[in-house]
Amino acid sequence: MGKVYKKVELVGTSEEGLEAAIQAALARARKTLRHLDWFEVKEIRGTIGEAGVKEYQVVLEVGFRLEET
């Protein structure tokens, strides 16, 4: 039998950079979701402060495998 996946959308943020924003979103997802298998970056944006980039924001679609019943 094939596997079934569910997708959720998350937004990770970081003042450090894009990779840190992705890692923040995935770290939080791991606390409540099991069987995380993949992610896709859907959107990249940020906020601007007086000195330049204030915060990076990455919208992710995360796929996780549903458990068989």
From Swiss-Prot:
Single annotated GO MF: nucleotide binding
Site residues by UniProt (May be important for ligand binding specificity and FMN binding): 65
Entries under SUPFAM superfamilies matching the protein: Dodecin-like
Record-linked InterPro entries: Dodecin, Dodecin-like, Dodecin-like_sf, Dodecin_bact
Record's keyword terms, sorted: FAD, Flavoprotein, FMN, Nucleotide-binding
A Pfam entry, by short name: Dodecin
Binding sites annotated in the UniProt record for CoA: 6, 28, 32-34, 65-67
UniProt binding sites for FMN: 3-5, 37-38, 45, 57, 65
Database matches in Gene3D superfamilies: Flavin-binding protein dodecin
Quaternary structure and partners: Homododecamer; four homotrimers assemble to form a dodecameric hollow sphere with an outer diameter of about 60 Angstroms. Flavin dimers are bound between subunits with a stoichiometry of 6 flavin dimers per dodecamer. Besides, trimeric coenzyme A molecules can be bound between subunits. A dodecamer can bind simultaneously 12 flavin and 12 coenzyme A molecules.
Function: May function as storage protein that sequesters various flavins and other cofactors, thereby protecting the cell against undesirable reactions mediated by the free cofactors. Binds and sequesters FMN, FAD, lumiflavin and lumichrome, and can also bind coenzyme A.
Protein family (similarity comment): Belongs to the dodecin family.
Protein name as catalogued: Dodecin
